[in-house]
């Protein structure tokens, strides 16, 4: 029998913004504990929110083997590593004042705009241990400005958005960024009939395209890239990888199954060559395919392989 232990702690501050004013502050601290056990090709999982007795949780996970959920134990290389990337980003003790100051400047610099939605701070801690000797731990934090913007003269519910995720907050830069949006919005554009390049968020179309690289779709032949593993399937200027480098903000260097990406990058496509597929360890073993380090799991669930694009917990980078 093999065992894994996962502990997560997430703290957050969230200011609700309405009509360019601070409306409320929400503080949340959540801890979760997970035990997974593997025996004879089966998995048992038990999880709990808040403080818990790990021995009791382990016993519950062992009992849950009776659910007979097939899942092989695929050991990762034994690694002992700890990273603490926490920075002094903002004054969290005076988070309302930080938010009010930013909103006051935005209101002054962009008087025709109304701002709504959230200003947030996250601090996360993750620890993964298995009985093979691996011990991985990570601490990180980030500051998120996620504002919807309405011009006072329009009937629209929302005209623009401004989103910034950073661990190096610069209030002046945030104001300058929004001022650029303001100036552009208030500059009439003369657009004639014709074809134009359109700039869109990758999530609009890329996530659907990346579905072709799920292991189960590939194995069933339901993907446009059938039999493409280790072959050049796209332009050699294109690389797509899960980013665990120092550039990734508040992202643990390991996934929820304890795998660590070599040099911080787990390639889906490297210079046009299909190197791996989106799969958890179960799917990778079932279909005998290499996998992108991208497993994610709820505190009381079996690991899944998910596609994450520019989310706080994981990044898929297209270069």
For every predicted segment, state its role.
Residues 1-252, 270-273, 307:
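Active-site bordering "gate/hinge" segments
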Residues 230-306, 310, 314, 319:
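Dual-mode signal for accessory low-complexity, basic/Gly-rich regions
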